[in-house]
Curated annotation (Swiss-Prot):
Keywords: ATP-binding, Helicase, Host-virus interaction, Hydrolase, Inhibition of host innate immune response by virus, Nucleotide-binding, Nucleotidyltransferase, RNA suppression of termination, RNA-directed RNA polymerase, Suppressor of RNA silencing, Transferase, Viral immunoevasion, Viral RNA replication. It comes from the Viruses. Residues 50-458 are annotated as: Methyltransferase. One of its GO terms (molecular function) is RNA binding. The lineage of its organism: Viruses, Riboviria, Orthornavirae, Kitrinoviricota, Alsuviricetes. Residues 830-1085 are annotated as: Helicase. This is Replicase large subunit. It holds the Pfam family ToMV_Hel_N.
């Protein structure tokens, strides 16, 4: 132990001394990486060459003043005023950076040669020749152009491409590039210029009269003018000479003449008007007309150059409230003089105007006046007796040092000579030991004598003042003034005979105060400017013509009367109905009668839309002759189909019942298909159909069900073939999960490009050398698949359902008679039995195997029945009388027996109703018994997007028999069954209590070692099943997979903490889960849910009730009280009460146990202990496994204890864990999807649901790359981003499939108790480089803007840059008296669940909005197979698809995906309100709307682990949406707010104050306590244990509103 301690101490000392090589290497690597990043950042800035020779100090001045540029100093050109001349090019580039590239720009007095060299063909220079020097300067610019062209010619080069347009413009039309008129008289006329016009003025506004400047800008329609000029604040002090030290220049003023020159050089001077420059400096408003004015704003001062901009302002846009009636004084006097015979009141009326006023003030800071005082100096001429006085600025410290020192002199020593000697001594330098010690004060030596005189007089007067105070203002016969002048005369003698008179006249000495004044100057001087303009514009609101609308309403009246018999007629969309009838020329009364018949299922036809809406019915009733191409035509006539043999010869195969160019009723099913070989080499296009949802079914309901079943087989086959064709087209873009299901064979090399997991596939899709695609039935020999010469590749699928679909289609098509299925006249009996009632046992007891037939859905069930039937040793059940449904249909007609007396179908309700009807007809039976359970899981449509109307799901039967005695279920489960079934359910089981539940702390607790599970393991979701299998559990199935099975003991597990829609009180999945066991069931769950409540209720049952099997529940009624207030939100100020303990108590009640977790060192523990991780393919740089040590500042310690964690340090282990839990943990739930066609259908629903009808088609006249769109994007960007865009050469695109990976240092707090058992992974950020964002950012910004402008904002809110107040306004018109269903779709792992289908949907939306095809393809390739690199942690990996969290489309892409997902699953035409934000959604539907199985649809189509949750109040983006009688109020989640108060990353008190302000902004609505009761109900919906919380809401308001009190929530961590 001692040796270990010694070794540790020695290693630590070596590290401190720098002897640890590993630490030194890491530090060097970190230093190197930092240097590389810094240099790369500098390289992205615009480059400017500085050729003039300047000093090192001047180099530093230029670099610091213009950090936006990467300046290269060559020092190759000696010139006069080198720094100022070189800075002029920087100033020009800085001004041009403010202007959008390509916008028409006027350069006032500019250098046209500079613009030519930069290739700016959009700049026009106004260069008037105001003097000879201007002519010389213009000729010099021409010389520079000639010199440049001669160099190119000498080198055999041509003008570069970026300069060619500008040089061509100057060569062909030189007056377009430059003119020699003043800007006020410029005659340049732009040709076809669109967009805004800009101007720049670089050191040229001196010569433009300020009063003409605004009108000149307006004449050229200039939107903004940017200007730069030399100036100094000291010119405002009326100094006659001012130095500009940085550029070694100076201003000198003589009256109104202001001269600018460079010091230490023999150069020409520049003369300007001082008063004119002063107007530019001090004025704010520059009127241009009686309506418009240009407003000046200073931007920045750099190296003695002032930058400002002049913005064009339309005064008519001022709010009319600033207008007031006032009298124009000049107009008043004019009216009085010209019209004395009028009354005075008439003159007043003539002069009265409606005026708009505005004012501004500008402060000028005089930095050189800091610590300075103004000292008066005076002098007199002995010859002329002319008196002069001036004031100088002298160091305050110098003045009072002198005054304090000489004040100590005795009366005899206080002489002018002594004072001058002392002042000279402290100003002079001293040499000590050969080293010069300079004076502390740099005072001009020429002023020392005058200053000494002032100091002397000031001190003399101070002495006399002291004597006066001592003598109580009485000094004898002489007055104080006389004493003063006696002393002065004695001191000076006859040298200054008129000193007294001079001092009095100049007020140097104030006799009344007996003091000499030394003033302290103001550091700021304020200049005011005022704008007064006359209000002239007046616009009247046009009247609305409603006569046409009223006439249309009268026409629709009779039709609406017919529709009033519908159950939900009050929700009928009259506008849509009338528009559709008018555009399609459908009679409204006819359409109304058909709608009533269709909605009542009495029409004899079915429109397989999601809902038979008004618009779809009108479309179906459209006249056949006027139907557009592809529209539906309802006809009863038979159309002959060409011979099947002829179709096969052409490689085409017509599928039955699939909508396309022909309606379903026009098909005449051919009976020539005898075997599956006739499918061989059918073209893939003939099997792929798109418009599956536009089929019209006619005939009796059984016939319609049978047609729908045929179409479902075709749709399944179509989707599978489409996916195989897609794989053949793009083999390289297949992700790892897809590779496990499919295979691709290269015929030429006889090698599998993608090796399938299974072998001997019966079918596949063939790609020929002509790039044609055919379905082929495969054969095998010794070498593998038998191929043809024209075959290029073969794609196969491991899913055998396609082969069975082909076989079943072949059989069913043979059964059709004239295109119509035959309906059997056999009696159909439904045996509805409760779970465990012995349905299989009853079948075996009733069946006669010699003449009856048993059909079951699965192979295992068929083998089980045969085994039980033959258990006596006598073989009675064979494959001829006990079959699976698929086997019977595929091999129909091949067995010896074709007719059966009775048909028994086990679990028949799990089959498609049309399939059941076919089975009855094919068996030729007399009576059919269909055994099933109406309350258990029904048939699930596995083909995403295929229509299966609700009334098709009801099996048409002649008789229903019930079985209400369960042989399996214990008594407590039987008690639950009585709630679900009509009639009394009895049980024969001797077990009374069998169910129990256990709340586990988190998903990590469930593992085979610490939590072995007893019996059969079941889960609700596939993701939970996969999680258990990955942890080592075996024989795990979902509830749906074991329906009909029986087990002695069951362990039911739920690992998903988010709501699951199938776990509900009336869910069939819950019923199946509770009824699988005979002895015991234990439910392990991480969250409270309805099943826990059910089990707890069953655990409390008494033996008496279990013996009775009886449920007696009363009807609950709710008292309703009408609202008292109407209108807007009632506001009641919340009292500021409570203490810290209130917040702690509330948090502990809502999340018990979280505050007791000691998690400050969890990250350290994970790094120091052994850990085992399962990762996908990646590359790890183990040299990054030990992070470089950093000096960490101890943060403030919170007083409120929450589950918040300390900030993590990024490193290989942390980043890898985050990547495993995020990017490597994507679910796989989706079924068979025809990706391209289904995506197209989904996008159709998206546009129909959310976009206004008139904006559903993109505006082709608007370019996404317009100047306006670029301007809008640039306004949102920082200067650094714009600089990177300017540095990018645009020659080629960067690698769009390369991403960087990083993690957020602060873990995200969860509002649950999972922190007690899990180590939360950090959030990952996957992002592109800035160059890619700069390319696609403006593009997607414009696409987003177009999308949001097209959304129906009255019903839908896409939450982008919205405030809580805007959310309240959106939901404010909800009527609380109307019953509503509040729905939330909760999705786990939203970003990582997105796969190829999501990308296809999103790209299709962007494409329809106008996304250019080439860039769209580039963007698509960059989001398929992508490479992630984490340089900090040393990790590199590859992922497929997934949403990139740092992408330019992350937020809007997630928003449109969630909206598209909901539009594909829910009836959006009935929605009241809907809001979407990222993965959050909130929907308001009328009460009682029917919704599909959202989890099923989300799993199969969207790969989402989604749950549709019904609530009383909405929860959206961390806020509770409380709708009430007066409108809506949005409260920030108080529990989330308290959780943030436990933050452990607050650095210091300043950071804490910023944190408080941010919390105040989001929690401002808590100041209103009027709706605290509703907030309590909303919180209790989410957190069941939450107490009434008004006390804690008030406490939050109290602490957040007081910055001092808020500091008490934290203590200094360094003092702990």
């Amino acid at each position: 132990m001692a040796y270990t301690q010694t070794a540790t101490t020695s290693a630590l000392l070596d590290t401190v001394r720098g002897n640890n090589s590993l630490v030194n290497d890491l530090a060097k690597r970190r230093l190197y990486d930092t240097a590389v990043e810094e240099f790369n950042a500098r390289d992205r800035r615009p480059k400017v060459n500085f050729s003039k020779v300047i000093s090192e100090e001047q180099t530093l001045i230029a670099t610091r003043a213009y950090p936006e540029f990467q300046i290269t100093f060559y020092n190759t050109q000696n010139a006069v005023h080198s720094l100022a001349g070189g800075l002029r090019s920087l100033e020009l580039e800085y001004l041009m950076m403010q202007i959008p590239y390509g916008s028409l720009t006027y350069d006032i007095g500019g250098n046209f040669a500079s613009h030519l060299f930069k290739g700016r063909a959009y700049v026009h220079c106004c260069m008037p020749n105001l003097d000879v020097r201007d002519i010389m300067r213009h000729e010099g610019q021409k010389d520079s152009i000639e010199l440049y062209l001669s160099r190119l010619e000498r080198g055999g080069k041509t003008v570069p491409n970026f300069q060619k347009e500008a040089f061509d413009r100057y060569a062909e039309i030189p007056e377009d590039a430059v003119c020699h008129n003043t800007f006020q008289t410029c005659e340049h006329q732009p040709m076809q210029q669109s967009g805004r016009v800009y101007a720049i003025a670089l050191h040229s506004i001196y010569d433009i009269p300020a009063d003409e400047f605004g009108a000149a800008l307006l004449r050229k329609n200039v939107h903004t003018c940017y200007a730069a000029f030399h100036f100094s604040e000291n010119l405002l002090l009326e100094d006659s000479y001012v130095n500009l030290d940085e550029i070694n220049a100076c201003f000198s003023r003589d009256g109104d003449k202001l001269t600018f020159s460079f010091a230490s050089e023999s150069t020409l001077n520049y003369c300007h008007s001082y008063s004119n420059i002063l107007k530019y400096v001090c004025k704010t408003y520059f009127p241009a007309s009686n309506r418009e004015v240009y407003m000046k704003e200073f931007l920045v001062t750099r190296v003695n150059t002032w930058f400002c901009k002049f913005s064009r302002i339309d005064t008519f846009l001022l709010y009319k409230g600033v207008a007031h009636k006032s009298v124009d004084s000049e107009q008043f006097y004019t009216a009085m003089e010209d019209a004395w015979h009028y009354k005075k009141t008439l003159a007043m009326c003539n002069s009265e105007r409606i005026l708009l006023e505005d004012s501004s003030s500008v402060n000028y800071w005089f930095p050189k006046m800091r610590d300075m005082v103004i000292v008066p100096l005076f002098d007199i001429s002995l010859e002329t007796s002319k008196r002069t006085r001036k004031e100088v600025l002298v160091s305050k410290d110098f003045v009072f040092t002198v005054l304090n020192h000489i004040r100590t002199y005795q009366a005899k020593a206080l002489t002018y000579a002594n004072v001058l000697s002392f002042v000279e001594s402290i100003r002079s330098r001293v040499i000590i030991n050969g080293v010069t010690a300079r004076s502390e004060w740099d005072v001009d030596k020429s002023l020392l004598q005058s200053l000494s005189m002032t100091f002397y007089l000031h001190t003399k007067l101070a002495v006399l003042k002291d004597d006066l105070l001592i003598s109580k203002f009485s000094l004898g016969s002489k007055t104080v003034c006389q004493h003063v002048w006696d002393e002065i005369s004695l001191a000076f003698g006859n040298a200054f005979p008129s000193v007294k008179e001079r001092l009095l006249n100049r007020k140097l000495i104030r006799v009344a105060g007996d003091a000499l004044e030394i003033r302290v100057p103001d550091l700021y001087v304020t200049f005011h400017d005022r704008l007064v303009t006359e209000y002239k514009a007046s616009v009247d609101m046009p009247a609305l013509d409603i006569r046409k609308k009223m006439e249309e309403t009268e026409v629709m009246y009779n039709a609406l009367s017919e529709l009033s018999v519908l159950r939900e007629s009050d929700k009928f969309d009259v506008d849509v109905f009338s528009q559709m009838c008018q555009s399609l020329e459908v009679d409204p009364m006819t359409a109304a009668k058909v709608i009533v018949a269709v909605m009542s299922n009495e029409s004899g036809l079915t429109l397989t839309f999601e809902r038979p809406t008004e618009a779809n019915v009108a479309l179906a009733l459209q006249d056949q002759e006027k139907a557009s191409e592809g529209a539906l035509v309802v006809t009863s006539r038979e159309v002959e189909e060409p011979s099947m043999k002829g179709s096969m010869a052409r490689g085409e195969l017509q599928l039955a019942g699939l909508a396309g160019d022909h309606p379903e009723s026009s098909y005449s099913r051919n009976e020539e298909i005898e075997s599956l070989e006739q499918f061989h080499m059918a073209t893939a296009d003939s099997l792929i159909r798109k418009q599956m949802s536009s089929i019209v079914y006619t005939g009796p309901i059984k016939v319609q069900q049978m047609k729908n079943f045929i179409d479902s087989l075709v749709a399944s086959l179509s989707a599978a073939v489409s996916n195989l064709v897609k794989i053949l087209k793009d083999t390289a873009a297949i992700d790892l999960e897809t590779r496990q299901k499919f295979g691709v064979l290269d015929v030429a090399s006889r090698k599998w490009l993608i090796k399938p997991t299974a072998k001997s596939h019966a079918w596949g899709v063939v790609e020929t050398h002509a790039r044609k695609y055919h379905v082929a039935l495969l054969e095998y020999d010794e070498q593998g698949v038998v191929t043809c010469d024209d075959w290029r590749r073969v794609a196969v699928s491991s899913e055998s359902v396609v082969y069975s679909d082909m076989a079943k289609l072949r059989t069913l098509r043979r059964l059709l008679r004239n295109g119509e299925p035959h309906v059997s006249s056999a009696k159909v009996v439904l045996v509805d039995g409760v779970p465990g009632c012995g349905k299989t046992k009853e079948i075996l007891s009733r069946v006669n195997f010699d003449e009856d037939l048993i059909l079951v859905p699965g192979k295992q069930a068929a083998e089980m029945i045969r085994r039980r039937a033959n258990s006596s040793g006598i073989i009675v059940a064979t494959k001829d009388n006990v079959k699976t449904v698929d086997s019977f249909m595929m091999n129909f007609g091949k067995s010896t027996r074709c007719q059966f007396k009775r048909l028994f179908i086990d679990e028949g309700l799990m089959l498609h109703t049309g399939c059941v009807n076919f089975l009855v007809a094919m068996s030729l039976c007399e009576i059919a018994y269909v055994y099933g359970d109406t309350q258990q899981i029904p048939y699930i449509n596995r083909v995403s997007g295929f229509p299966y109307p609700a009334h098709f799901a009801k099996l048409e039967v002649d008789e229903v028999e019930t079985r209400r005695t369960t042989l399996r279920c214990p008594a407590d489960v039987t008690h639950y069954l009585n709630r679900r079934y009509e009639g009394f359910v009895m049980s024969t089981s001797s077990v009374k209590k069998s169910v129990s539940q256990e709340m586990v702390g988190g998903a990590a607790v469930i593992n085979p070692i610490s939590k072995p599970l007893h019996g059969k393991i079941l889960t609700f979701t596939q993701s939970d099943k996969e999680a258990l299998l990955s942890r080592g559990y075996s024989d795990v199935h979902t509830v749906h997979e074991v329906q009909g099975e029986t087990y002695s003991d069951v362990s039911l597990v739920r690992l998903t903490p988010t709501p699951v829609s199938i776990i509900a009180g009336d869910s069939p999945h819950v019923l199946v889960a509770l009824s699988r066991h005979t002895c015991s069931l234990k439910y392990y769950t991480v969250v409270m849910d309805p099943l826990v409540s059910i089990i707890r209720d069953l655990e409390k049952l008494s033996s008496y009730l279990l013996d009775m099997y009886k449920v007696d529940a009363g009807t609950q009624x709710q008292l309703q009280i009408d609202s008292v207030f109407k209108g807007s939100n009632l506001f009641v100020a919340a009292p500021k009460t409570g203490d810290i303990s209130d917040m702690q108590f509330y948090y502990d009640k809502c999340l018990p146990g979280n505050s007791t977790m000691m998690n400050n060192f969890d990250a350290v523990t994970m790094r120091l202990t052994d850990i085992s991780l399962n990762v996908k393919d990646c590359i790890l740089d183990m040299s990054k496994s030990v992070a470089a040590p950093k000096d960490q500042i101890k943060p403030l310690t919170p007083m409120v204890r929450t589950a918040a964690e300390m900030p993590r340090q990024t490193g290989l282990l942390e980043n890898l864990v985050a990547m495993i839990k995020r990017n490597f943990n994507a679910p796989e739930l989706s079924g068979i999807i025809d990706i391209e066609n289904t995506a197209s259908l989904v996008v159709d629903k998206f546009f129909d649901s959310y976009l206004l009808k008139e904006k559903r088609k993109p505006n082709k006249n608007v370019s996404l790359f317009s100047r306006e769109s670029l301007n809008r994007w640039l306004e949102k960007q920082e200067q650094v981003t714009i600089g990177q865009l300017a540095d990018f050469d645009f020659v080629d695109l960067p690698a769009v499939d390369q991403y960087r990976h990083m993690i957020k240092a602060q873990p995200k707090q969860k509002l649950d108790t999972s922190i007690q058992t899990e180590y939360p992974a950090l959030q990952t950020i996957v992002y592109h480089s800035k160059k890619i964002n700069a390319i696609f950012g403006p593009l997607f910004s414009e696409l987003t803007r177009q999308l949001l402008d097209s959304v129906d904002s009255s019903r839908f809110l896409f939450f982008t840059r919205k405030t809580p107040a805007q959310i309240e306004d959106f939901f404010g018109d909800l009527d609380s008296h109307v019953p509503m269903d509040v729905l939330e779709l909760d999705i786990s792992k939203y970003d990582k669940s997105q796969n190829e289908f999501h990308c296809a949907v999103e790209y299709e939306i962007w494409r329809r909005l106008g996304f250019e095809d080439f860039l769209g393809e580039v963007w698509k390739q960059g989001h398929r197979k992508t490479t992630l690199k984490d340089y900090t942690a040393g990790i590199k990996t590859c992922i497929w698809y997934q949403r990139k969290s740092g992408d330019v489309t992350t937020f809007i892409g997630n928003t449109v995906i969630i909206a598209a997902c909901l539009a594909s699953m829910l009836p959006m035409e009935k929605i009241i309100k809907g809001a979407f934000c990222g993965d959050d959604s909130l929907l308001y539907f009328p009460k009682g709307c029917e919704f599909p199985d959202v989890q099923h649809s989300a799993n199969l189509m969207w790969n989402f682990e989604a749950k549709l949750f019904k609530k009383q109040y909405g929860y959206f983006c961390g806020r509770y949406v409380i709708h009430h009688d007066r409108g809506c109020i949005v409260y920030y989640d108080p529990l989330k707010l308290i959780s943030k108060l436990g933050a452990k990353h607050i650095k210091d008190w300043e950071h804490l104050e910023e944190f408080r302000r941010s919390l105040c902004d989001v929690a401002v609505s808590l100041n209103n306590c009027a709706y605290y009761t509703q907030l309590d109900d909303a919180v209790r919906e989410v957190h069941k244990t939450a107490p009434p919380g008004s006390f804690v809401y008030k406490s939050l308001v109290k602490f957040l509103s007081d910055k001092v009190l808020f500091r008490s929530l934290f203590i200094d961590g360094s003092s702990c």
